[in-house]
Amino acid sequence: MKLLLSCISTKHSMLKKHWTQTSQDISCPLTVLGSHQKPKEDLGGLLCLIEDMGSTQKTLELKMAAGMVTSDNGVFVTSFSGVHEVDTNLGIVRHNIVSSPLFNALHSISRTQRGYLVASTGLDLLLEFNRSGEILWSWWATDHGFELTPDGQPRVLDKLADHRSIQYGTRAQTTHINSAAELPDGRFLASLFHQGMVIAIDRETGEWQPVLEGLDHPHAVRVLDARHFTVADTVRGRALLVTINKLGAQVEADIDTGTNWLQDCRYDSDRNCWILVDGKNSRVVLRHGRSGNKKLAEFNFDPEWRLYETHVL
């Protein structure tokens, strides 16, 4: 198996210092509710290519590397305000292949039938775009019932401003929407960090309905097929395989990953294994089968790396 691992920061201790100074809980790699302001220092970031079951690793510095998806010429990688493209050997980097004034704190990215879908998390916004940067579809959480921050403050956004250099703290956001993926029927699934749920969004109307509730600050929604998706119940450390239909969703498999910050999870059906990103302990764990009851491998990394997600090459 050949994996790419993204690290949104390579200065984890600096982040913890920032959270301490702003009276935040540092028991997890991210604060449970987040902070009002982002640190002003350069937080670094990188990609790590993992081969030969972890025995071979290659790194490439890339600031605030986060979401990854297969592109026409390699892999698209999101950063704070742009989408870069790397080849699968990390030999070539094309910076800012796509950038938009509406890109702010980009998180996960996925393919759609028409292009790509990215979570512009800092703006509580989903954007679908093509390779030329044309915006094909957008969904603002603040226009669809999510007007208030966790502190009860109304959020008003200037949709015509250039947000690429503005820092919005997690608690200044109403949802901290951090991942989204398209279902074969055209609806979009999205994970809402603050609300603890996965929702399904109608492309035409923008109307949404809850699909899975009661999660603890979820991440990493991925669609497997017309009937299944996966999501990380982050603080509980649970990787969930979920069956979905028009009426709702039901958890089919629930894997306890032994962490209190599961940053990312994906089920690789071709290899019949889970790939789990433990942000608390800076490790990636492979587990066999849908039930994940057998550990196949564990890769440990520098504690200064704040791991984000993996991409299977």
Language-model regions: role of each:
Residues 55-110:
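Blade-loop segments of beta-propeller domains
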Residues 97-102, 136-175, 253-258, 298-313:
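Surface-exposed loop and turn segments in beta-propeller and other repeat-based domains
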Residues 216-286:
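Loop/turn-rich, solvent-exposed surfaces of beta-rich toroidal or solenoidal domains
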Residues 5-42, 77-81, 118-122, 190-194, ...:
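Conserved beta-strand positions in repeat-built beta-propeller and related beta-rich domains
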Residues 51-53, 87-91, 130-134, 202-206, ...:
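Short loop/turn segments that connect beta-strands within beta-propeller blades
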Residues 70-73, 111-114, 182-185, 224-226, ...:
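Residue-level detector of Asp-centered blade-edge/turn motifs that repeat once per structural unit
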Residues 66-68, 108, 179, 220, ...:
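Conserved beta-strand position repeated once per blade in WD40 beta-propeller domains
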Residues 43, 64, 105, 122, ...:
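Beta-rich catalytic cores
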